[in-house]
Amino acid sequence: MSSGGLLLLLGLLTLWTELTPVSSKNRPPFCNLLPEPGRCNAIVRAFYYNSRLRKCLEFPYGGCGGNANNFKTIDECQRTCAG
């Protein structure tokens, strides 16, 4: 690769790093999990962080099981994952 190409690549990587939100670098890994309704049959209002859309969304939680990307309130989800 030519020195001009390397310089362009370095510039693009630097720009991408600067534009990536700081919070995503410190976001807990479980925030990237898909919502998991669990194994029970209750329908409980819960929230999960959608890493593709970069926001918290509501989903029907079964009441038990599931994963750590499961919050009782949208505020808790936003503080933990969207911060």
UniProtKB/Swiss-Prot annotation:
Tissue: Expressed by the venom gland.
Signal sequence residues: 1-24
Location in or out of the cell: Secreted
BPTI/Kunitz inhibitor domain span: 31-81
Keyword annotations: Disulfide bond, Protease inhibitor, Secreted, Serine protease inhibitor, Signal
Major localization listed first in the record, in broad terms: secreted
Pfam families found in the cross-reference section: Kunitz_BPTI
GO molecular function: serine-type endopeptidase inhibitor activity
Function of the protein: Serine protease inhibitor.
The family this protein is said to belong to: Belongs to the venom Kunitz-type family.
Protein name: Kunitz-type serine protease inhibitor C
Organism: Bungarus candidus
